[in-house]
Amino acid sequence: MSTPTPLSYKDAGVDIDAGNALVSNIKAAVKRTRRPEVMGNLGGFGALCELPTKYKQPVLVSGTDGVGTKLRLAIDYKKHDTVGIDLVAMCVNDLIVQGAEPLFFLDYYATGKLDVETATSVVNGIGEGCFQSGCALIGGETAEMPGMYEGEDYDLAGFCVGVVEKADIIDGSKVAAGDALIALASSGPHSNGYSLVRKVLEVSQADPQQDLNGKPLIQHLLEPTKIYVKSLLKLIEASDVHAMAHITGGGFWENIPRVLPENCKAVIQGDSWQWPAVFNWLMENGNIAEYEMYRTFNCGVGMIVALPADKVDAALALLAAEGEQAWLIGAIAPREGNEEQVEIL
């Protein structure tokens, strides 16, 4: 009987050395995001973080999300450096809705065969997103799983924890008829509706490299999700914000009602802003109904803020000073019976 060839983990498709190389590559990106509350260094079994001392009754707010099938486009067009920003944005923008300051972030990166260069690019993007939102990249998991993913495919998930003063939680309970609605511009489709985006590309047989308003269509589609955290934290501090809605999956129809009392509805002026060109392109080339556009995409509005009408001018000035494009988009009105909670006129 012959002696069998000795096997290693690498023979089975898992390269520990590649994982170690990745950790070495991302140290600078992680260090850049460090907050004073973080204890210890990258690589521990668990990540430690103190609560900021400025909070008297701190409440932790948690969230998790992914990038959806936008990853398919990013992988196909080898654009790996910004999907990490998307990942962070989808999580921290959800936290800021409740007034929470993001504290720390963890990521999960799964692939069939670890490509160190690709993974480094992705995690550096995560670090950039954390830096933009003032959030510490405190840890993560890189899972190399042969047989689970095809070719160069990978998947991402993000997990974020933030903190808000108990008395300052924003939950929509203060929303009342007469409140104004301010919209903050999106950078594009963000990270939602990409299964429909890909279907439009397929059905229309469009060239993703074709010019649209001076840059390739694919560049519009892969533009990273805008992170609103720092500008909205300043707005919360300076104004009386009653509610915020992050316009993600489900669009206007599903996200705005999540923060409204049952007796209120949002009345939005559809002509108060101009859709970015990419949404008009999708609507035309996919023959998508307007209702479906508002149900699937943000249509140029990444965040909506409800606040007293007499605070609008100051809020718009503050947001402009923070580099945000924002405008008055509508108002809160009384809701009668079983009326829809969102009207777009």
From Swiss-Prot:
Gene3D superfamilies the record matches: PurM-like C-terminal domain, PurM-like, N-terminal domain
Name this protein carries in UniProt: Phosphoribosylformylglycinamidine cyclo-ligase
Gene: purM
PANTHER family membership: TRIFUNCTIONAL PURINE BIOSYNTHETIC PROTEIN ADENOSINE-3, TRIFUNCTIONAL PURINE BIOSYNTHETIC PROTEIN ADENOSINE-3-RELATED
EC numbers, comma separated: 6.3.3.1
Reactions listed under catalytic activity: 2-formamido-N(1)-(5-O-phospho-beta-D-ribosyl)acetamidine + ATP = 5-amino-1-(5-phospho-beta-D-ribosyl)imidazole + ADP + phosphate + H(+)
Any one GO cellular component localisation term in the record: cytosol
Pathway: Purine metabolism; IMP biosynthesis via de novo pathway; 5-amino-1-(5-phospho-D-ribosyl)imidazole from N(2)-formyl-N(1)-(5-phospho-D-ribosyl)glycinamide: step 2/2
